[in-house]
Amino acid sequence: MRLFIIRHGDPDYAHDSLTEKGLREAEALAEWFADVRLDEIFASPLGRAQMTAAPTAAWKGMEVKILPFTAESMDYMASFSAQDDIGYTYSVKGGVSDYRDGSGRFEERSATLAEMIKGSDEFLAGYGMERRGGIYRAFGTCEKRVAVFCHGGFGAA
């Protein structure tokens, strides 16, 4: 399996869309993917990820399938410490303030992360991958090439 994880183009967070720059980035990415084999295209349910995926899907004549578990979580912006399955400890004090929306309403971290992990595990299992500790390993052969258009808040969480 070859997995392309793509963060959306330059965002207009207030309208859950892309700026003019973000639209140009999405078009440039579609041109880059023109000569790259893709078997499936997925995106978060949020507009900015779907708008980034749309030009690539149009160039390829493909459908964009929605993956709800890839929606952006703002949990990573709250202060936390966590230890992963392979022994690393991460501490973030005050989160990443650049993206705060001012609402102060952050999800309960463990529940959101559990949903993302479960969704990721189920998704990747469909392509012959299995989580063992903090690492995914192949338990079968899969030649698929898959693009997932999502968010920094998905990858950071």
Language model region names:
Residues R48-Q50, S73, G155-A156:
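Short, active-site-adjacent cap segments at secondary-structure transitions
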Residues G61-G133:
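Phosphate-handling substructures
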Residues Y13, F106, R145:
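Short, flexible active-site loop motifs that bind/organize anionic cofactors or intermediates
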Residues L124-A157:
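Active-site-adjacent alpha-helix immediately C-terminal to a catalytic or transition-state-stabilizing loop
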Residues R2-P68:
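Active-site-proximal alpha-helix that buttresses catalytic centers in soluble enzyme cores
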Residues S17-R24, Q83-T89, V148:
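Short, functional N-terminal and low-complexity linear motifs
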Residues L18, P45, R109, L113, ...:
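Aromatic-acidic/polar surface patches that form glycan- and anion
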Residues M1-R2, V146:
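A generic secondary-structure signal marking the coil-to-beta-strand transition
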